[in-house]
């Protein structure tokens, strides 16, 4: 049956622009958009329900395309230590940092991981998020990576959201492989990835290319394995140094390369040629008090699509608000509100390979949208906090919180 959503204004975000339709209406049928346009051009039809949006602005549902939402414990004590002047290296040397999250995640049951993640993600839903990507990477062995990926699948079953899973086994070196990074990469490629993929738990494969993680050559082995399994790839690249990770990602036609503070002009050109999306993570940039900015002007000049994401994780971006990331993206990286909104809608969809079905409001696409009590879409980026969404609609059905 068809449902009519009327008396609204729409920022469709087609082609990465507001692409306004004022005095508009949307007709949904099942989980899809059946018709969208000016209300005065609405075709005569019969509707099972009519919803008056009372002049609200409507945007596509938000897409958080890079998160680590499933983890055990938190690192608030480390946050306090860093503020007292203790370095990340000192924290890591004392058993903190990612190692502490790996321990807590390994110790947690599936049920504990699921319940804690659901609390976090429900906060994000209320901010307008209708699609989320979640990475593994705190298990670092087959049993616990599998546990994380199973939890991610369960989140997609429990919540009215689109949930994509990414295997990030190549996130850090587990303690049992100390000083044996090549052996761990071999284990990922010959044991973990094939088994996890065979169980239907993996939508994409990611890795962390950095001096403190894995080299470009090691990452390439992971990419080749993913490619042989028919899985798309993504990459944490150029966050702390320039290793050419983003160019490597481009060579493998990665969906995205993420962070990118230290990428070069050649990296930008390679990503532009491959169509790889640049995912910027202002939350981590802010919390780590970084000073090296991603090359925004170069990315825009060469036509690289820019997405924004929360990078929700317990160590460097405990961010539960994607709307806050919008403001940070504009304030820190000087993106316009229009560019920032494109970064969590159509460009974020492209970073997940979902642009044909998600990310903009068009006939035939999935009916994920948010109605806002605002006078212009730029207000979504402008306001810090507050309860702006009037309605969150997922697959044509209003989400009740």
From Swiss-Prot:
Annotated residues for binding of 4-imidazolone-5-propanoate: 75, 138, 171, 239, 316
Compartments reported by the entry: Cytoplasm
Residues that hold Fe(3+) according to the record: 66, 68, 236, 311
Binding-site residues for Zn(2+), renumbered to this chain: 66, 68, 236, 311
Swiss-Prot/TrEMBL catalytic activity: 4-imidazolone-5-propanoate + H2O = N-formimidoyl-L-glutamate
GO cellular component, one term: cytoplasm
The record's free-text note on cofactor binding: Binds 1 zinc or iron ion per subunit.
Keyword annotations from UniProtKB, A to Z: Cytoplasm, Histidine metabolism, Hydrolase, Iron, Metal-binding, Zinc
Function: Catalyzes the hydrolytic cleavage of the carbon-nitrogen bond in imidazolone-5-propanoate to yield N-formimidoyl-L-glutamate. It is the third step in the universal histidine degradation pathway.
Pathway, per record: Amino-acid degradation; L-histidine degradation into L-glutamate; N-formimidoyl-L-glutamate from L-histidine: step 3/3
Main EC class the enzyme belongs to: hydrolase
Secreted in keyword set: no
MF terms in GO: imidazolonepropionase activity; iron ion binding; zinc ion binding
Protein's name according to its UniProt entry: Imidazolonepropionase
Annotated CDD domains: Imidazolone-5PH
Cofactor: Zn(2+); Fe(3+)
InterPro entries cross-referenced by the UniProt entry: Amidohydro-rel, HutI, Metal-dep_hydrolase_composite, Metal_Hydrolase
GO biological process: L-histidine catabolic process to glutamate and formamide; L-histidine catabolic process to glutamate and formate
Entry EC no(s): 3.5.2.7
Family to which the UniProt record says this protein belongs: Belongs to the metallo-dependent hydrolases superfamily. HutI family.
Native source species: Acinetobacter baumannii (strain AB307-0294)
Residue sites binding N-formimidoyl-L-glutamate per the record: 138, 313, 315
């Amino acid at each position: 049956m068809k449902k009519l959503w009327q008396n609204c204004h729409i920022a469709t975000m087609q082609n990465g622009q507001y692409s306004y339709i004022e005095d508009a209406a949307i007709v949904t049928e099942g989980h899809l958009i059946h018709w969208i346009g000016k209300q005065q051009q609405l075709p005569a039809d019969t509707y099972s329900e009519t919803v008056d949006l009372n002049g609200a602005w409507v945007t596509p549902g938000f897409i958080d395309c890079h998160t680590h939402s499933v983890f055990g414990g938190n690192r608030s004590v480390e946050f306090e230590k860093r503020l007292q002047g203790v370095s990340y290296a000192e924290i890591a040397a004392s058993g903190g940092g990612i190692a502490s999250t790996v321990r807590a995640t390994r110790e947690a049951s599936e049920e504990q991981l699921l319940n804690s993640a659901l609390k976090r993600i429900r906060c994000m839903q209320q901010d307008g998020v209708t699609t989320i990507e979640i990475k593994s990477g705190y298990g670092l062995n087959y049993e616990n990576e599998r546990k994380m990926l199973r939890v991610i699948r369960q989140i997609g079953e429990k919540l009215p959201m689109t949930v994509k899973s990414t295997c990030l086994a190549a996130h850090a070196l587990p303690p049992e492989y100390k000083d044996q990074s090549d052996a761990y990469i071999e284990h990922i490629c010959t044991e973990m990835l094939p088994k996890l993929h065979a169980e239907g738990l993996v939508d994409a494969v990611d890795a962390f290319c950095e001096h403190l993680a894995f080299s470009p050559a090691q990452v390439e082995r992971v990419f080749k394995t993913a490619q042989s399994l028919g899985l798309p790839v993504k990459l944490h690249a150029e966050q702390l140094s320039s290793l050419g990770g983003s160019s490597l990602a481009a060579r493998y036609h990665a969906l995205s390369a993420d962070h990118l503070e230290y990428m070069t002009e050649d990296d930008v050109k390679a990503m532009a040629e491959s169509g790889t999306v640049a995912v910027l993570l202002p939350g981590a940039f802010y919390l780590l008090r970084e000073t090296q900015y991603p090359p925004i002007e170069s990315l825009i000049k060469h036509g690289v699509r820019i997405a924004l994401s929360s990078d929700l994780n317990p160590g460097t971006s405990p961010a539960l608000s994607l709307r806050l990331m919008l403001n940070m993206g504009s304030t820190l990286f000087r993106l316009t509100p229009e560019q920032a909104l494109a970064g969590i809608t159509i460009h974020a969809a492209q970073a997940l390979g979902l642009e044909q079905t998600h990310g903009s409001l068009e006939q035939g696409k999935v009916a994920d949208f948010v109605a806002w009590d605002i006078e212009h879409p730029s207000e979504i980026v402008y306001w810090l906090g507050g309860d702006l969404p009037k309605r969150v609609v997922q697959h044509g059905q209003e989400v009740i919180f």
